[in-house]
Amino acid sequence: MSNLKQLRTRIKSVKSTQKITKAMQLVSASKMAKIKSQIANSNFYIEAVSKMMSAILSIDMYELSIEEQKFFNTVPNKANLLIVMTSQRGLCGTFNYSIIKQVKNDIKELENKGEQIKLIIIGKKGYEALKRQYVNYIDSYFELPKIHDENLMLQVKQKIMSAVENLEVSNCVIYFNKFKNAMTQIMTRQQILPVAKYQDDSMIDNPIVNLVGFGYKERGVKPINNRRATSDIVGESKSIDYNYEYEGESLISNLINLYVNSQINYALLQSRASEEGARMTAMENATNNANDLISKLVLKLNRSRQAIITTELIEIIAGSEVV
């Protein structure tokens, strides 16, 4: 009988755990849907800013101020700034493992080359995994808030801008998981600075803004003084009027700020969506495993009960035969 009691207790415990994992699965599914909506709404803005920054590469560097040129050129013999985005909580499968593994491999490679390293870590899990081995490299650590917070973006951006302006780093790379679907997250290593040529990953078809319209001249092209910029939308060439609030010099500076902010925002949204997708999948698997375990325990319970009943019947029959 004690065996039956243990089985019933275990079944009750597994059912309780199953309710928790199911609830977590539903919560993660809801959060993932909201973040996917945020990503869709911000894609146009992020891609447009990236393309404008890429277009600056076609401008003669003497058109830019010395401060602005720092964001487009590599500074030799300075630290490599690595921004690592992980989760604040666990129970999300291999979400953090793939990021941490790649960061450790890259750090080892940089150490072998004798290069300097600085780490900005976002998320408790990444900090816990890296602090013991690379505590001397950690420049900053930020906890990931429960909801998407612009203050976090601004703090990280200020760290990056300050490091570049003070010539403390030669480049800046961000590590995050890119969301593909609930079951698939792609470990991504993306260079933020120096600004690289924009690579279209066919997210959406958006206008490509030509900075010639801002009064800057392309290499080998005479300056254009009009106040119109061109845009290519699905193969069509259209002219778009813009209202400018900044002069040419301050425009680039503000665009650099927008660019860095948009890249951090993009990585944070992708990382959050990937985290919730990974957690939803992990909790779904846990719920299914709990269901399978309950079925096995119930079967074992029924067999044990049947064995006890059979034994009692045999004893009764044996007793009646003696009488």
UniProtKB/Swiss-Prot annotation:
It is found in: Cell inner membrane. Residues 206-240 are annotated as: Insert. CDD domains: F1-ATPase_gamma. Keywords: ATP synthesis, Cell inner membrane, Cell membrane, CF(1), Hydrogen ion transport, Ion transport, Membrane, Transport. It comes from the Bacteria. Belongs to the ATPase gamma chain family. Produces ATP from ADP in the presence of a proton gradient across the membrane. The gamma chain is believed to be important in regulating ATPase activity and the flow of protons through the CF(0) complex. This is ATP synthase gamma chain. It comes from Rickettsia conorii (strain ATCC VR-613 / Malish 7). The lineage of its organism: Bacteria, Pseudomonadati, Pseudomonadota, Alphaproteobacteria, Rickettsiales.
